[in-house]
UniProtKB/Swiss-Prot annotation:
Presence of the UniProt keyword Hydrolase in the record: yes
Entry superkingdom: Bacteria
Keywords: Hydrolase
Name the record gives this protein: Deoxyguanosinetriphosphate triphosphohydrolase-like protein
Amino acid sequence: MSVGMAAPHAPYACDPDRSRGRLVAEPPSRTRSPFRRDCDRVIHSTAFRRLKYKTQVFVFHEGDHYRTRLTHSLEVAQIARALARQLGLDEDLTETLALAHDLGHPPFGHAGERALDACLKEFGGFDHNAQALRVVAALEHRYPEFDGLNLTWESLEGIVKHNGPLTDRSGAPVGHYREHGIPVGIADYIKVYDLELWSFASLEAQVAAIADDIAYDAHDIDDGLRAGLFDLDDLKAMPLTAAIIAETSAHYPDLEDVRRGAELVRELISHLIGAVFAEAQKNLAATKPQSAQDVRQQSRALIAFPADVAEEEAAIKRFLYQHMYRHKRVMRVMGEAKQILFDLFAKYLKSPAELPPEWLTGAEADNEGDRARRIGNFIAGMTDRFALTEHQRLFDSTPDLR
């Protein structure tokens, strides 16, 4: 048993003693399992620290209590660990994937991703999962023997495949990737290190992915209430949240709205975690996987919402899309944020000398695609705050994003 390993694993869990290893071989740690080392490397990375000033929905300066990419990632990790513990999975690997899942996000949330994707359209586009892989495989410069974090194979496959297979066994893209193709960063990397894009990822990765959904649903409701984009009465339009609100009101008729909102978020998380756990138990009993590789060979994800809860969860996402993500206030700020990234990309492409010295290598290449990708990597690593400051340095007028 690896040093530092928690409770005994279920047979279908990823076993750190049987890890497929790292691209660059390293001697084992005397005090930590391979997956614990992965998690610690993510936590100590500069990319992880930068998440503190990256938008979840609201730009960092709009309020001190709104989620950022960092606080969101910590909340995803808490939910993921709880599920992993219940299912007998490796908590260290699960935590690694929960904390690493947003490392590739650019500043200004999904608006920033759309802006960079447009800027890089002629050069393979921008995909935050592919960018997370670039971060952990190349862009972090902390170790003398290798670029990136040199994570285990299991962590890398989880970062790339947590939402499911990208190809079939023949290598043909499936699902979303059938139309858009395999993101260039992933397609390039698997030539060096095969992540078996045709298979499902481990249960640890599947748990991290569904924990992300749960955290989004519950905590975006919390932030939306705090921002005044909607209120508790609006949330009664959905049967699940209406039932939780009604039960809370029955137990605590005089409770103020702030506490009722907090109780809604808490009960919603508990409800969704419980539903996922019950569905996972049912799926595991039906398929009887005896190893992590058995999990990868399945024809569907084993960690999922049951059908009725999946519809409840989809209704929450529809509500948030209409009342929060597409709210005119949010849309106005995100429109201005996209323009900031358009401006920065065009400026750096025309005048690479404006980049920091350490980023000039590659940005002055003769190949325009190489230059564009280098600039895209630089912008993707920016925080909201740095992007604003850099725009103010390079341009006469910069929106304040308020």
